[in-house]
Amino acid sequence: MKSKEQIDKKFIEAFGEEQFKIQEALNALDPISKEVAEYLEVPELPIVVEPIPEDSRIYYKEEFIVLRKDIALNKLEAMKSIVHEYRHYYQFLCIKNAKYEEPLLEHYAEGFQYMIEHGNKNDGTDDYYSLIIEIDAFAFQRYFLKEVYGIETHYPNEEYDKILDKFIENFY
């Protein structure tokens, strides 16, 4: 039986050092993915690394999460992105399955309709950040990382931070 070092060496020979680092980073993120999926009571999703313009993205139909390489290699940023995308997956499943006990269901539907009409991308505008599905995802990301891992996160904009705090106070 081959040792981990031998297997790692073969992997590096076949795919390169950079791909090895990415795979190691993804392996380290598996427990986080599992934990947030269990918390939200949604299926666990595969996570891959692709060259995308935004930090992360979720593919609802295909059911997987994409991280940009630099995000995947930064554990805190990867954790934030994974939790954020899982919250979007939860929102999507609430709408798809008509989970009426979710108090924000109607707002989720409106947010997804906006994304369909305007494209599912972070364009850096106030319109994007003011969508309830984005406020909810950023607030959940902040709440979950603090409650489960003791990690405090902040948004660069102090006013947006206050909005997230108020949202957490009202909904979590």
Task: Go through each PLM region and give its residues.
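Active-site oxyanion-binding pockets that recognize sulfate/phosphate
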Residues: 19, 72, 76, 127
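Short, function-defining helix-loop hinge/capping sites that tune catalysis or transport
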Residues: 92-96, 142
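Active-site scaffold of zinc-dependent metalloenzymes
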Residues: 42-77, 86-93
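A structural signal for well-ordered alpha-helical segments within the folded catalytic domains
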Residues: 27, 76, 80, 84, ...
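Auxiliary, metal-adjacent structural segments of Zn-dependent hydrolase domains
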Residues: 2-61
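Metalloprotease/metallohydrolase-associated module, dominated by Zn2+-dependent proteases
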Residues: 100-172
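Surface-exposed helix-capping loop/turn segments at secondary-structure junctions
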Residues: 37-44, 96-98, 148-155
